[in-house]
Amino acid sequence: ASNVTGSGLLIEKILHESELPSDLFRTIIIDHDQSEALIGNDKVRGVTLTGSDSAGALVGQQAAKAIKKAVLELGSNDAFIVLEDADIETAVETCTQARLINNGETCVAAKRFIVVDSVYDEFRKRIVEKFEGTKAGDPMDDSSDIGPLARADLREQLHEQVEQSVAKGATIAVGGKVPEGK
């Protein structure tokens, strides 16, 4: 995403500092209108994209036009499933990490939690306790579990989603209010 190019650049730097061939990996920061020329280049054999449905449709069309392999991971709604034989403590720990990884601002962060009835009450009780104990703060402070969202508009959008969900019948188990500060 355009607001987090540093991750790709850091991956490229690390790979270039290693023993791997220097041309093995490239981070290319371009606008959507530049992607067709890149995908159509004879040296490009395939393309991957993790992103929105609209970005995937554009990249998929361009890859098909150039007859290139494409792998698209779009608009994920990643499920986290807890079955009756699960170790609840492990499930709670893993679930918390899966939801909060990179502040939840990654397409692979768990978003749907499916829990069988037989362990639901215990799982819900423990996961609520875990999230209540999660400390938001400065990401450089080791005592913080999560930092702020990447952009203010994302914070507003997330709060609107919560309000819409409540209006449609959802209940809030933890939080639900926008924290003070930036």
Residue ranges of each PLM-predicted region?
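Conserved small-residue-rich beta-alpha loop and adjacent elements
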Residues: 1-23, 67, 89
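Conserved functional loop/turn residues at catalytic and ligand-binding sites
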Residues: 19, 42-43, 169
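ALDH superfamily catalytic-core signature
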Residues: 24, 46, 52-182
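A general structural signal for stabilizing positions within well-ordered secondary structure
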Residues: 16-19, 38, 61, 104
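Short alpha-helical
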Residues: 3-6, 32-34, 53-55, 65
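Short beta->alpha connector loops at strand-helix junctions that form conserved
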Residues: 1, 29, 50, 83-84
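A structured beta-alpha segment of the ubiquitous adenosine-cofactor-binding alpha/beta core
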Residues: 26-45
